[in-house]
Amino acid sequence: MFNNKIDKNIRDLLNLISSSRFNTYLVGGCVRDIILGYTPKDLDVLVEDDIDEFSIFLSRSLNSKIIKFQNHGFETFRIINTKTKLNIDITKYSNGNDGFLNDLSMRDFTINSMAISLNDGKFDFNDIVDPFHGLEDLNNNLIRYVSKDSVLFDPLRLLRSVRLSSKLNFNIEENTKKYFMINSEKINIVSNERIRDEIIDIFALNNSSKALILMEELNILNQIFPEIQLTNGINQGGLHDKDVYMHSLATLYFI
C-alpha cells in the first residue's frame, strides 16, 4: 500500500542504498511523510557499518559532495543530491539492534520514530519498524512524545510540535501537551538562531495564526514573544470587536 506512494527519484535512491553491502535504515520524518503520501525534502539514514565508507559510496554514486558536521554530539554526514534536491543525512548507530532501538528512542515524536530496513536489495514500507506505535498515532492524527527524556534532549521539540500540529492538522496528545506546558521555559535554553528558523517555518504555514494560539496554550508564546502575549485583553474601542491580541491573529490569518 505505502510503496505505491513513493516518488520515483526517492525510490531509485532507496534501491541504490538497499542494494549496497551496508546495513542501513531509513528513519524519522521522511518515513512519516512517505506514509502520508508526501514527498520528503530530506532523508535520514542510519548506518551500522563504517559511516565514512558508506558516505563515500553514496556521494560517488550520486556524484554529490559530502558535508560533515556534529548534530547534538553525533557525527553526521550530509549529502546534497543536486539531481533530486534532496538532503541525505547519514548517522551511525552502534551495538547492533540495541543501538538502533536506542536511536529511535531518542527521537522527538512517535510519528518520527519509525524506520524501514534498507537491506538485502529491497525495502518495504508495509514492513515498518515501529517500537513506539508511531503508525497508530499517525492514523489517529496524534503527536506524542517518545519519552520525557527525548523532549529534554532538545527543547526545540516543544516548538516543533506546534509546527507539526499545524502543518499536519494533528492534535498534541494530552499527556504530551501537559508535559510541554510544565516545561515551556526550557525553550529558553535553545539558541536564538534555531528558534528563529523554526518560527520562520511556522509563519510560512497557511494556518500560522492557529499555530500561535497553540503556542499560547503550551505557554511557549510568552517565552518567545512576551510582547504579543501582553496584548491579550487590551481593548481597542470603537468599532473593533476583538482585543489587540485576537485582532493580530485575525490579521495574520488573512495575510
Located regions from the model:
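Catalytic cores of the polymerase beta-like nucleotidyltransferase superfamily
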Residues: 1-255
